[in-house]
Regions:
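Short, contiguous pre-domain boundary segments
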Residues: 14-43
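Catalytic cores of DNA base-excision repair glycosylases
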Residues: 38, 43, 52-262
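Intrinsically disordered, low-complexity N-terminal extensions of nucleic-acid-metabolism proteins
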Residues: 1-18
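Intrinsically disordered, low-complexity, compositionally biased regions/tails
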Residues: 13, 262-264
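Extended substrate/cofactor- or partner-recognition/assembly subdomains adjacent to catalytic sites
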Residues: 47
Length: 264
């Protein structure tokens, strides 16, 4: 059970075990379709370093409070609070928010002023309140008070896109799906030499590749996605990647170029 392995899921695995949980053929095919050089060799090399990546997560991963729950409403609402917002800011209001609004119905019945006061520190207050209200309506009016388990339905509230919907399915309902945001897209580009499209989070090709790379075992899928998110935030940053302290540096095209370790 994933819940027994919170906050990060399964962080200990061998490369051989991992290989039985990914769709290597589909992933390689997606790399070839994207014109990635030496697709199979690159995929194999990266897969060998994923166990180190998960081990790194177990030591350096960020232990946010929402990583200790699989409660669907907490997961869904938290992902809305995290939109365009730092995790540390959301962590500060996490307990007061869910004390006040432990269910979707509590948000539906809340005074506008109370809801606004609780999310004010995060900014984008109008956006946030509207999305939370619509998410609560979705659960209560359309789904008997429960968070939907359908990718399309989860994207019905205003400004809820594939990232938030997929994160909900992954973290609450243990569906082994890939998350595509700026961090995971940047790592994909650097590690594989993957030529990113203009909007990676809307690209079917990017999802096809990363969904094939995400392990089909839920606890591993959780760990793999969290590892990419945290690696992007803590090591593989946009402007200053810290390759010397990165667990997948030996297999990363970008990180190994300077040391002549790239696949020829
Ligand atoms: S080696 Fe460098 S570029 Fe590659 S994933 Fe790690 S931090 Fe990013």
């Amino acid at each position: 059970m994933v819940s027994e392995a919170l906050p990060f899921g399964q962080t200990s695995v061998t490369a051989v075990e991992l290989r039985s949980h990914v769709d290597a053929a589909a992933a390689t095919e997606a790399l070839v379709a994207a014109d990635v050089d030496h697709a199979r060799e690159r995929f194999d090399a990266v897969l060998e370093t994923v166990p180190e990546l998960l081990e790194w997560l177990s030591v350096h991963g960020r232990e946010y409070p929402w990583r200790y729950t699989t409660d669907p409403w907490r997961v869904f609402a938290t992902e809305i609070l995290l939109q365009r917002t730092r995790g540390d800011a959301v962590a500060e209001i996490y307990n007061p928010f869910f004390s006040a609004f432990p269910t979707p119905n509590a948000v539906r019945e809340a005074d506008e002023a109370d809801l606004r006061d609780l999310v004010r520190s995060l900014g984008f207050v109008n956006h946030r309140v509207r999305t939370l209200r619509e998410a609560a309506d979705l659960c209560v009016v359309e789904n008997e008070g429960q968070v939907p388990t359908d990718l399309e339905a989860l994207q019905r509230p205003w400004r809820v896109g594939p990232y938030t919907a997929r994160a909900c399915l992954l973290f609450a309902f243990q569906e082994p799906l890939a998350l595509v945001d700026a961090n995971t897209a940047r790592i994909t580009e650097r590690v594989f030499g993957y030529p990113l499209p203009e909007q990676p989070h809307k690209s079917e090709a990017v999802y096809r590749f990363l969904d094939a790379l995400v392990p089909d075992e839920p606890a591993l899928a959780r760990a793999f996605n969290l590892a990419l998110l945290d690696l992007g935030a803590l090591r593989c940053t946009n402007s200053n990647p810290d390759c010397s302290a990165c667990p997948i540096q030996p297999s990363c095209l970008y990180g190994s170029v300077g040391e002549g370790l790239g696949v020829d």
